[in-house]
Regions:
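Conserved ABC ATPase signature
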Residues: 90-94, 98
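Hydrophobic anchor residue at the start of the ABC signature
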Residues: 104, 116, 132
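A short, proline-enriched helix->beta-strand linker immediately N-terminal to the Walker B motif
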Residues: 109-113
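Conserved ABC ATPase "signature" region
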Residues: 15, 67-85, 194
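ABC ATPase NBD coupling module
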Residues: 3, 16-33, 59, 181-185
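Short catalytic/signature loops enriched in Gly
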Residues: 178-246, 250-251
Length: 255
């Protein structure tokens, strides 16, 4: 859909950012799946759930007969917390959380190595968000599937992620393990995001000071920065002068 202006996208050691061979496309469509932001908009309203989930099986011929296909669909429904009889229903007959479970089932049935979850909980109620994220964690522990979890809710990002990358205006500003980013955020944009998270502890919440960040007035130029090592696997993109200044800042009080 878009031609990259710079950089490469590597998956399993193969460059998938440009034109791909048919074999690479087939491999990619088997090994990489997507969970979309809006569960209602991403499900065909005219198809039953069994056909929505089974579409990938049909395209890639992953079953021997109709009975095996039916069994695979019902097994994946059970894995995501839905009943086998839900297979014959249409998307409008489900709640938002249930529809997102259908979307997760559609991705999982292909046994992918990577699932890209694009703001997959932002359209759901808070209580339902927790259910969906817990489901995704359980599935990951069971199957070993990797997630690229795209979100703006950093409390959920902290809960589900092993590593975090902070993006702004198309630039990767800071990367590290969840502990490294949350314990020692360096970039002003990262600090502003983390300082905005309310604390459930009233004592900590009273001390919390939300930092503001405006790229236009910050004097920071993302194109001039280079990768600087903070510690371990924690890196920040900045100039030498910015790195020296930011490393002197006091730790945040946000948790």
């Amino acid at each position: 859909l878009y031609d990259p202006t710079a950089g490469k996208i590597l998956f399993e050691g193969k460059d998938i950012s440009g034109k791909m061979s048919k074999d690479t496309q087939k491999l990619l469509r088997n090994d990489m799946q997507m969970i979309f932001q809006d569960p209602m908009a991403s499900l065909n309203p005219r198809k039953k759930v069994e056909d929505i989930i089974g579409e990938g099986l049909d395209i890639h011929h992953k079953f021997a007969n109709a009975a095996e296909r039916d069994q695979m669909v019902k097994a994946i429904l059970k894995k995501v917390g839905l009943a086998p009889e839900h297979a014959t229903r249409y998307p409008h007959q489900f709640s938002g959380g249930q529809r997102q479970r259908v979307g997760i089932a559609r991705a999982l049935i292909m046994n992918p190595k990577l699932i890209i979850a694009d703001e997959c909980i932002s359209a759901l109620d808070v209580s339902i968000q927790a259910q969906v994220v817990n489901l995704m964690k359980d599935i990951q522990e069971e199957t070993g599937t990797a997630y690229l979890f795209i979100a703006h809710d950093l409390s959920m990002v902290k809960y589900i992620s092993d590593r975090i990358g902070v993006l702004h205006l198309g630039h990767l500003l800071e990367t590290g393990t969840t502990e490294e980013i949350f314990n020692h955020p360096v970039h002003p944009y990262t600090r502003s995001l983390l300082s905005a998270i309310p604390s459930p502890n009233p004592v900590v919440e009273k001390k919390r000071v939300a930092e503001t960040y405006d790229y236009k007035t910050s004097g920071i130029d993302y194109t001039k920065g280079t990768k600087h090592l903070v510690e371990g696997s924690h890196y920040v993109r900045c100039t030498d002068a910015e790195f020296s200044e930011w490393m002197k800042k006091a730790p945040l009080v946000y948790d």
